[in-house]
């Protein structure tokens, strides 16, 4: 018989062993029950929130998931922070009088009438509020600027207001939020505010604000009228959809081959 050829075994590569310092002991952590404390992470989704907060969170998520029609979606496009700050500075100059100021004015007026002095009473320039009042001013073409809150509940109260403003060619803007508008007029909340005129010293600043607002809202009305919102699914749902798409693409490629 012919001698068998020896099969050479491939020599194993020598790996350099890591030299560990004997002073440092390895102590792997066990994160099971009764073990080490787990690392900190965001646990907000496991918190049992109060019912009012739970409803707020669910409402916000639903608005992201469901398809939102353009009439409602336009209320997500609010005035930018810098422009809103300058707008509220102007609005605060024309705050209506509060109860204390009104009482003081009426007392002075009564004293003047008692003394027989003529009381000068000029109509003050103030911010108008109240949905019916603001609507009337828009219809009469007296409104120069309409400010609408983005978070009015129910939204049906003001959903038609941008269309009316555009029809009557009145500049309008949507701002955050109803409590901030309410603070201007000494109320808890306000759905909308309106300015009919301003003083001469504020006309230059007011005209600049109006130009910016027209460019952001009145001129873009047609664009916002066609833009739907929502339809954004969660991360788990998106991952499932991508996995399905990959499987379908793979099957299509196999068929082609």
Curated annotation (Swiss-Prot):
One of its GO terms (biological process) is ribosome biogenesis. SUPFAM superfamilies: L30e-like. Keywords: Ribonucleoprotein, Ribosomal protein. GO terms for molecular function: mRNA binding; structural constituent of ribosome. InterPro entries: eL8/uL1-like, Ribosomal_eL30-like_sf, Ribosomal_eL8-like_CS, Ribosomal_eL8/eL30/eS12/Gad45, Ribosomal_eL8/Nhp2, Ribosomal_eL8_euk. It holds the Pfam family Ribosomal_L7Ae. Coiled coil: none annotated. One of its GO terms (cellular component) is cytosol. Belongs to the eukaryotic ribosomal protein eL8 family. PANTHER family: RIBOSOMAL PROTEIN L7AE FAMILY MEMBER (PTHR23105). This is Large ribosomal subunit protein eL8z.
């Amino acid at each position: 018989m012919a001698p068998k050829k020896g099969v050479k075994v491939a020599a194993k590569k020598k790996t350099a062993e890591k030299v560990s310092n004997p002073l440092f002991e390895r102590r792997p952590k066990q994160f099971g029950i009764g073990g080490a404390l787990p690392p900190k992470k965001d646990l907000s989704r496991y918190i049992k929130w109060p019912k009012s907060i739970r409803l707020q969170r669910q409402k916000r998520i639903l608005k992201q998931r469901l398809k939102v029609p353009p009439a409602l979606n336009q209320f997500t496009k609010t005035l930018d922070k810098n422009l809103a700050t300058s707008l509220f500075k102007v609005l605060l100059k024309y705050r209506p009088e509060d109860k204390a100021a009104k009482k003081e004015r009426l007392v002075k007026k009564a004293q003047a009438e008692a003394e027989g002095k003529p009381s000068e009473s000029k109509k003050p320039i103030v911010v108008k509020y109240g949905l019916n009042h603001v609507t009337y001013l828009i219809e009469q073409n007296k409104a120069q600027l309409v400010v609408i809150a983005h978070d009015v509940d129910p939204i049906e109260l003001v959903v038609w207001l941008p269309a009316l403003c555009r029809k009557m060619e009145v500049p309008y803007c949507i701002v955050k939020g109803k409590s901030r508008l309410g603070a201007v007029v000494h109320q808890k909340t306000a759905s909308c505010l309106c300015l009919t005129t301003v003083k001469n010293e504020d006309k230059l600043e007011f005209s600049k604000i109006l130009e910016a607002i027209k460019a952001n809202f009145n001129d873009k009305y047609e664009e916002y009228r066609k833009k739907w919102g929502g339809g954004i699914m969660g991360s788990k749902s998106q991952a499932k959809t991508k996995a399905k798409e990959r499987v379908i693409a793979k099957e299509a490629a196999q068929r082609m081959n």
